């Protein structure tokens, strides 16, 4: 799986590396309106004390196209998975090289894509925190608030709405 496709898929779904690596056709569900969803139990990591939970993610066109692109990939067919992912350590190594080349000071890892989904893709587009929490498979919105960075643009927009309502 090209690194670009992997990172793009994660940015548009919010799935963690372990969830993408174990994603199978059974996790793809079409609703009665014809829309596709990922419904997946999150991988429980005993050593990190993560609780099991369910991610319920409506799929946008970009991740759908990526899934379709790899549907007949030999590795996917052989392993029964949706995407032919490399190991997380190798992917993070590539991301570090890219960040260094671009002069990005942030520690760029696969988990940054999950944060991108939680902030830029969802919250910045006015998706309610509770809905983002369900898509990320969090047990509570308290966990999601860790991902939710308040953006000045959303604060300004909110206050402009208040200002309009209060004007006489």
Q: Where on the chain are the PLM-derived regions?
A:
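Short, basic (Lys/Arg/His-rich) helix/loop patches that form interaction surfaces
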Residues: 13, 74-81, 85, 93-134
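C-terminal secondary-structure termini that scaffold catalytic or DNA-interacting sites
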Residues: 61, 73-77, 162-168
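Catalytic cores of nucleotide-enabled group-transfer and carboxylate-activating enzymes in metabolic
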Residues: 33-38, 120, 131, 144
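Basic, Lys/Arg- and aromatic-enriched nucleic-acid-binding interface segment
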Residues: 1-17, 21, 125
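Conserved tyrosine-mediated DNA breakage-rejoining catalytic core shared by Y-recombinases
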Residues: 22-68
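Catalytic-site neighborhood detector that most strongly recognizes the C-terminal catalytic loop/helix
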Residues: 42-44, 88, 123, 136-161
């Amino acid at each position: 799986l090209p690194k670009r496709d992997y990172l793009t898929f994660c940015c548009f779904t919010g799935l963690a590396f372990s969830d993408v690596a174990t994603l199978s056709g059974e996790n793809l569900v079409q609703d009665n309106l014809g829309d596709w969803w990922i419904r997946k139990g999150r991988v429980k990591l005993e050593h990190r004390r993560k609780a099991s939970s369910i991610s319920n993610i409506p799929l946008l066109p970009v991740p759908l196209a990526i899934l379709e692109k790899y549907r007949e990939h030999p590795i996917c067919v052989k392993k029964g998975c949706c995407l032919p992912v490399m190991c997380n350590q190798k992917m993070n190594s590539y991301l570090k090289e890219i960040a260094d080349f671009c002069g990005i000071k942030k520690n760029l890892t696969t988990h940054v894509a999950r944060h991108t989904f939680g902030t830029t893709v969802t919250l910045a587009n006015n998706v309610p925190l509770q809905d983002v929490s369900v898509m990320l498979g969090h047990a509570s919105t308290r966990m999601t608030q860790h991902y939710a960075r308040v953006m000045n643009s959303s604060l300004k927009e909110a206050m402009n709405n208040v200002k309009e309502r209060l004007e006489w």
